[in-house]
């Protein structure tokens, strides 16, 4: 599970005690020349707990954005980024960290990281549902 591979994940484990990788959108990926990256994971699964400042699920928001920071430790592969959509996220633990992969038709995303740090949450209502 992706949350288990993040440091600083205490709040996230309360928000989502179960697996969230079956339907995640990689909403943002950026990388700098030093190899640090930001990845935003959009989750359209209702959280296990209510957080008052976010409002009511399904009324005020229906998507949770998990903001993370990582350090690239190997390959980065992105093809057909604009075809990205909600899809299963595969997370594989390695000796050097983790590999995160998502594939949907021609869209393909794969990144090798030495680690992933939870940075924060934002929420929004996508107009669907």
For the regions a language model picked out, list residue spans one by one.
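Surface-exposed, interaction-prone regions used to assemble/regulate multi-protein complexes
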Residues: 1-129
């Amino acid at each position: 599970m992706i949350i288990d591979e993040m440091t600083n994940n205490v709040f996230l484990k309360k928000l989502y005690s179960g697996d969230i990788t079956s339907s995640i959108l990689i909403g943002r990926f950026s990388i700098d020349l030093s190899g640090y990256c930001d990845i935003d994971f959009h989750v359209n699964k209702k959280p296990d707990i209510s957080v008052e400042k976010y409002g009511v699920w399904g009324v005020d928001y229906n998507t949770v954005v998990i903001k993370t920071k990582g350090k690239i430790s190997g390959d980065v592969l992105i093809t057909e980024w604009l075809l990205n959509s909600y899809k299963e996220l595969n997370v594989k633990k390695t000796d050097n960290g983790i590999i995160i992969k998502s594939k949907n038709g021609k869209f393909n995303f794969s990144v090798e990281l030495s680690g992933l740090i939870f940075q924060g949450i934002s929420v929004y209502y996508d107009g669907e549902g």
